[in-house]
């Protein structure tokens, strides 16, 4: 079996309905997967039931059977029984903390390596990389480790934008990712813009959507990755 993982930058683009832009990206992963488990642990400011309902509504046209992991007495068994795994956005630190709390980090990696499709957006994409050291989120809780699912052997930065508001004197996103590459110059970081996604199919990695991505690695800073690029070489990192 081969890894089949879709890593979305965001759940929305502009004012579009929740997950609407992602339907064409998600649909191919559902061909042989009807029963999905949704992991809402990144959702801190809403109830897990509310979060689940928004996902079910957003993906309703795909007619999937989606349940929340919080509805199952045994989270590990719920992962094993599902045909596919969905992880939504929110706070990446809280998400990873809970994945460690229920001992799901290694299990999810193993299940995806066996061919179980994985779909994540925002925080759900952050945790798919080597670690969460390039998340945008506030560290509201401390997970046992920053090491993540390792579905791709590099770092991700969803919602990537280097916009700086006039008069604002804080660091830009590019400056913050530069700091990471100074500390860890050998590990690539891919910034994915809202509306785009990375899709790993075994040894193939593709950039989906109509926006470029951006690569940071060592002395290479904010290198544009053209729309439709084959990024398979990053899987050999």
Curated annotation (Swiss-Prot):
Its EC number is 3.4.13.21. Keywords: Cytoplasm, Dipeptidase, Hydrolase, Protease, Serine protease. InterPro entries: Class_I_gatase-like, Peptidase_S51, Peptidase_S51_dipeptidase-E. The active site is at residues 122, 137, 159. It is an enzyme of class 3 (hydrolase). Hydrolyzes dipeptides containing N-terminal aspartate residues. May play a role in allowing the cell to use peptide aspartate to spare carbon otherwise required for the synthesis of the aspartate family of amino acids. This is Peptidase E. It comes from Shewanella baltica (strain OS155 / ATCC BAA-1091). The lineage of its organism: Bacteria, Pseudomonadati, Pseudomonadota, Gammaproteobacteria, Alteromonadales. The gene is pepE.
């Amino acid at each position: 079996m081969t890894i089949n993982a879709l890593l979305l930058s965001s759940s929305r683009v502009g004012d579009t309905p929740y997950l609407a832009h992602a339907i064409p990206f998600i649909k191919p992963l559902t061909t042989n997967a009807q029963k999905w488990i949704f992991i809402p642990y990144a959702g801190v400011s809403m109830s897990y039931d509310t979060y689940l309902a928004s996902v079910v509504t957003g993906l309703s046209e795909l007619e999937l059977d989606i349940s929340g992991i919080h509805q199952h007495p045994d989270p590990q068994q719920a992962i094993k029984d599902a045909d596919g795994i969905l992880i939504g956005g929110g706070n990446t630190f809280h998400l990873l903390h809970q994945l460690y709390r229920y001992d799901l980090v290694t299990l999810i990696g193993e299940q995806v390596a066996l061919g179980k499709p994985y779909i994540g957006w925002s925080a759900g994409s952050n945790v798919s990389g080597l670690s969460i050291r390039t998340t945008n989120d506030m560290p509201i809780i401390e997970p046992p480790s920053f090491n993540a699912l390792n579905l791709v052997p590099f770092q991700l930065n969803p919602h990537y934008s280097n916009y700086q508001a006039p008069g604002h004197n804080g660091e830009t996103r590019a400056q913050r990712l530069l700091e990471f590459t100074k500390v860890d110059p050998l590990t690539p970081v891919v910034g994915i813009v809202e509306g785009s996604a990375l899709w790993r199919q075994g040894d193939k990695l593709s950039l989906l959507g109509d926006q470029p991505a951006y690569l940071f690695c060592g002395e290479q800073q904010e290198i544009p990755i053209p729309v439709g690029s084959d990024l398979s070489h990053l899987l050999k990192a």
